[in-house]
Amino acid sequence: MKWSEISIHTTNEAIEPISNILHETGASGLVIEDPLDLERVEKAEFGELYDLDPALYPEEGVRIKAYLPMNSFLGETVEEIKSAINQLLIYDIDLGKNEVSLSEVHEEEWATAWKKYYKPVKISNRITITPTWEEYTPVSSDELIIELDPGMAFGTGTHPTTVLSIQGLEAYVKPGDLVMDVGCGSGVLSIAAAKLGADKVNAYDLDEIAVKSTKLNSKLNQIHESVKVKQNNLLEGVQQEADVIVSNILAEIIVRFVDDAWSNLKAGGYFITSGIIQNKKQLVIDNLTKQGFEVISLNEMEDWVSIVAKKPSEK
């Protein structure tokens, strides 16, 4: 079987939404060539576990690659992808060069080529993310391993927005907590919360593929009994009191459910937000404080910001 490799030259800001678009159109084997990864290896706080080849990366911007089966619908699928990407301009997302190209690859090339990009990565004090096909032995007794299949959906879980989210979970999740993951994607944050001791994790995503991916990855990590996954639009119709709510999505989406996050948090609970580009930081802060939240932590990585807010304890 022949496959078509679609390559999109864009910006770091556009990685997450374009990756989601590719998965929604049936693409497989997502690869992100981000030259900032080369800097992360040099400056890694926690120590990367692998080497990268600079020749694979663009000089500026990022390249997102994925694979589509070559069939009679390929042309329509590519046009659908281009149209969906251009729609991101509505959200004021910088698309950069926004160049789309196609090349033909054979199945045996496709089946192995993209795997060279994925190796175990230690992303916080306690958590290491590793692809399913890599053998990895923990280096300490308290190290927590999250296994992901990057070819299934939503990448590797090592994007700065995900790293910031997991570091937030590591700081604020306590054993026995109820955690909500809004916009769960691959389920990596839900898995992290469960491994950090959360008693229950409720994961929500509007995308059916994300729901399936979270369920599969939860089973892969043997924490599926703790993680309940539901197809849902943000927190619409949800009525529970969580200890922690985490959401790694666009700033414009976060501000749309700040009120629901407030309603579903216990007094003294934490709202961990990520996926926020620098120039949208104040937008999120303003909406959080207007609702009554207390912003207690701002964490940054490259152009991305994570904001942790607390619902004040009842007096």
UniProtKB/Swiss-Prot annotation:
Ranges in a coiled coil: none
Pfam families named among the record's database cross-references: PrmA
A molecular-function term among this protein's GO annotations: protein-lysine N-methyltransferase activity
GO-annotated cellular components: cytoplasm
InterPro entries with a match to the protein in the record: Ribosomal_L11_MeTrfase_PrmA, Ribosomal_PrmA_MeTrfase, SAM-dependent_MTases_sf
Superkingdom classification of source: Bacteria
Enzyme class: transferase
Any GO BP: methylation
EC number(s) per entry: 2.1.1.-
Catalytic reaction annotation: L-lysyl-[protein] + 3 S-adenosyl-L-methionine = N(6),N(6),N(6)-trimethyl-L-lysyl-[protein] + 3 S-adenosyl-L-homocysteine + 3 H(+)
Disulfide bond residue pairs: none
Binding locations of S-adenosyl-L-methionine: 162, 183, 205, 248
Subcellular location as annotated: Cytoplasm
Keyword Methyltransferase listed: yes
PANTHER family registered for this protein in UniProt: ELECTRON TRANSFER FLAVOPROTEIN BETA SUBUNIT LYSINE METHYLTRANSFERASE (PTHR43648:SF1)
Family per similarity comment: Belongs to the methyltransferase superfamily. PrmA family.
Name of the protein described by the UniProt record: Ribosomal protein L11 methyltransferase
